UniProtKB/Swiss-Prot annotation:
Residues 667-678 have a biased composition (Basic and acidic residues). Residues 114-247 are annotated as: I-domain. It comes from Saccharomyces cerevisiae (strain ATCC 204508 / S288c). Residues 1-96 are annotated as: N-domain. InterPro entries: 5-3_exonuclease_C_sf, EXO1_H3TH, HhH2, PIN-like_dom_sf, PIN-like_EXO1, XPG-I_dom, XPG/Rad2, XPG_CS. Residues 500-518, 535-550 have a biased composition (Acidic residues). The gene is EXO1. This is Exodeoxyribonuclease 1. Inactivated by calcium and zinc ions. The keyword Metal-binding applies.
Length: 702
């Protein structure tokens, strides 16, 4: 699209400007250039024929940008393809089909990212998409026009007539058509590049475009290649510039190339060149002022002298609609052109490719196609009058059965049997209303062993009224025992069900055990020895490991019989001595002031073994000779007995003597003798079972 390499050569005269420079002016906009740019955001939807409005949103955003800078847009859309550009259009069409096939294949394989690149290359901008933008322009009062052929020549014509003051486009062909001010590279911030034709003289000597005439510029472009001709192979803009400046005309340039023999000139190049020159200079456009088809520039008379020249000229600049034939063809005279139809095409009412069809909005067309997929068939014209069916014919009717005596007799007998059955049911329900109804309900479950029977009696048998029935039931509830099934099955949490029978004997045994524990505790307190080991409870109870089993047995809850009101035979066994463990000691029963309760041990609290060390210091080391200093240290491991602990008293005198044996060998021997004497004098006592790490200490007797 455009002339390859032309804009980079014009970089020295590209002026970065803002749209504020064109405040209050009208700028022509290449609509298809914006559509190509907007199609990148919805390439998949456009290629697959799905509805989308993303390209319309692009235009709306650009219109708001121009409105911000107080610039009035004038949209120009492409029309029908010009005959000179048919070869280029066919190549582009084939390329789009190839890219679409590649995109669909990649999309099916899961390569969606690569497929999107090919979808963007295969998008075809259609007049239906332009119609969507035209509808928006009509609603918002934005000026637009559909060119009969190329939008480039149409925009240049608007600029020549001073209808617009500049052209916004990405196509460099506009400079060849004669554009005076081209605005390119417009971004979302209103920043763009301006190229003015008046600045061509400022270009460097390497590319002196300002020294060439308009015809020579067209020749240079045709040599390097453009949309209308492929040019000569291996000839670029700089080479073409040199050839034009040296030989001026195309005939002399071709002769020089043929003479040198370095370049190959295609056979069709001369015809392509002549058609391109005519299309660049005299292409047909639509004049919005006169509302008729005109040429871009005035056609000179020498091009219309002969019939062959006229044919050649009008075939290159575009076919128009003939007034009489209503077909697009070569028309020599302006009076034979149907300007009214071209006006409708310019307004966007008719399709530029097929002016017999109205131009439809793409999105509306797809929405209608998706909502109604009805195939209309041709009506049958053979019948003169169509049969009109009444509305009842569309509903299903019930057909009447023919009278058959056998079927009638069978139906009559069935009805009689049904009537007899219903009458029997009614009699059974209504008769014997005052008879006692007994319903047996088996209430056997996993909680009860005996099945029970509930009797349902009629109210009238027990009394004449409901009040009499209430009085009878209240009196019976006090006299008659309640059945076992009607008793409450919930037992209070304070009662613990047991199967013990001899409650009195058990309570006596518990009291005896408790009194024995109290006596053992007193005896253990009276026989306290400073250097012995004895087991005590955390609360001060001096029971042994053998007594622990007895106390455990004493904690077994006792049972007693309790009866609920209204139950005569039902008895619930429970523990009436739950608080037996909180009773006072029997040894202090005579004295009320000195009675001490036996505190129970908490279930979740576990005591740790404590070590009490009795250390006798030497006379030389401390003034407090003979005084006992007791230190308390927690043991490292717990006792095997659940909530019990051990108290260990150790004579540390031997330990202190062992520490000083390293001072001299004499003291070492004395300490050994002293240890031997102490071990002989001490009496061995078996230690209580313990897993404490302090069990390695030697226990000493008195």
């Amino acid at each position: 699209m455009g002339i390859q390499g032309l804009l980079p050569q014009l970089k020295p005269i590209q002026n970065p400007v803002s749209l504020r420079r064109y405040e209050g002016e009208v700028l022509a906009i290449d609509g298809y250039a914006w559509l190509h740019r907007a199609a990148c955001s919805c390439a998949y939807e456009l290629a697959m024929g799905k509805p989308t409005d993303k390209y319309l949103q692009f235009f709306i955003k650009r219109f708001s940008l121009l409105k911000t800078f107080k610039v009035e847009p004038y949209l120009v859309f492409d029309g029908d393809a010009i005959p000179v550009k048919k070869s280029t259009e066919s190549k582009r069409r084939d390329k789009r089909k190839e890219n679409k096939a590649i995109a669909e294949r990649l999309w099916a394989c899961g390569e969606k990212k690569n497929a999107m690149d090919y979808f963007q290359k295969c998008v075809d901008i259609t007049p239906e998409m332009a119609k969507c933008i035209i509808c928006y322009c009509k609603l918002n009062g934005i000026r637009y026009i559909v060119a009969p052929f190329e939008a480039d020549s149409q925009m240049v014509y608007l600029e020549q007539k001073n209808i617009v003051q500049g052209i916004i486009s990405e196509d460099s062909d506009l400079l060849v058509f004669g554009c005076r001010r081209l605005i390119t590279k417009l971004n979302d911030y209103g920043e763009c590049l301006e190229i003015c034709r008046d600045n061509f003289i400022k270009l460097p000597k390497k590319f002196p475009l300002g020294s060439l005439t308009n015809e020579e510029i067209i020749t240079m472009v045709c040599l390097s290649g453009c949309d209308y001709t492929n040019g000569i192979p291996k000839v670029g803009l700089i080479t073409a510039m040199k050839l034009v400046r040296r030989f001026n005309t195309i005939e002399r340039i071709i002769l020089s190339i043929q003479r040198e023999g370095k370049l190959m000139i295609p056979d069709t190049y001369i015809n392509e060149y002549e058609a391109a020159v005519l299309a660049f200079q005299f292409q047909r456009v639509f004049c919005p002022i006169r509302k008729k088809i005109v040429s871009l520039n005035e056609i000179p008379l020498y091009l219309k002298d002969t019939e062959s020249k006229r044919k050649r000229l009008y075939a290159c600049i575009g076919f128009v609609i003939h007034r009489e034939t209503q077909k697009k063809q070569i028309v020599h005279f302006d009076d034979d052109i149907d300007h009214h139809l071209h006006l409708k095409i310019a307004q966007g009412d008719l399709n530029p490719y097929d002016f017999h069809q109205p131009l439809a909005n793409r999105e509306h067309k797809l929405q209608l196609a998706s909502k109604s997929n009805i195939e209309f068939g041709k009506t049958n014209t053979t019948n003169s009058e169509a049969k009109v069916k009444p509305i009842e014919s569309f509903f299903q009717k019930m057909t009447k059965l023919d009278h058959n005596p056998k079927v009638a007799n069978n139906i009559h007998s069935l009805r009689q049997a049904e009537d007899k059955l219903t009458m029997a049911i009614k009699r059974r329900k209504l008769s014997n209303a005052n008879v006692v109804q007994e319903t047996l309900k088996d209430t056997r479950s996993k909680f009860f062993n005996k099945p029970s029977m509930t009797v349902v009696e009629n109210f009238k048998e027990k009394g004449d009224s409901i009040q009499d029935f209430k009085e009878d039931t209240n009196s019976q509830s006090l006299e008659e025992p309640v059945s076992e099934s009607q008793l409450s099955t919930q037992i209070p949490s304070s009662f613990i069900t047991t199967n013990l029978e001899d409650d009195d004997n058990l309570s006596e045994e518990v009291s005896e055990v408790v009194s024995d524990i109290e006596e053992d505790r007193k005896n253990s307190e009276g026989k306290t020895i400073g250097n012995e080991i004895y087991n005590t409870d955390d609360d001060g109870d001096g029971d042994t490991s053998e007594d622990y089993s007895e106390t455990a047995e004493s904690r077994v809850p006792t049972s007693s019989t309790t009866s609920f009101p209204g139950s005569s035979q039902r008895s619930i066994s429970g523990c009436t001595k739950v608080l037996q463990k909180f009773r006072y000691s029997s040894s202090f029963s005579g004295v009320n002031a000195n009675r001490q309760p036996l505190f129970p041990r908490h279930v979740n609290q576990k005591s740790r073994g404590m070590v009490y060390v009795n250390q006798n210091r030497d006379d030389d080391c401390d003034d407090n000779d003979g005084k006992n200093q007791i230190t308390q240290r927690p043991s490292l491991r717990k006792s095997l007995i659940g909530a019990r602990s051990q108290r260990i008293v150790i004579d540390m005198k031997s330990v202190d003597e062992r520490k000083s044996f390293n001072s001299s060998p004499i003291l070492h021997e004395e300490s050994k003798k002293r240890d031997i004497e102490t071990t002989k004098s001490s009496q061995a006592r078996p230690a209580v079972r313990s897993i404490s790490l302090l069990s390695q200490f030697v226990y000493k007797g008195k």
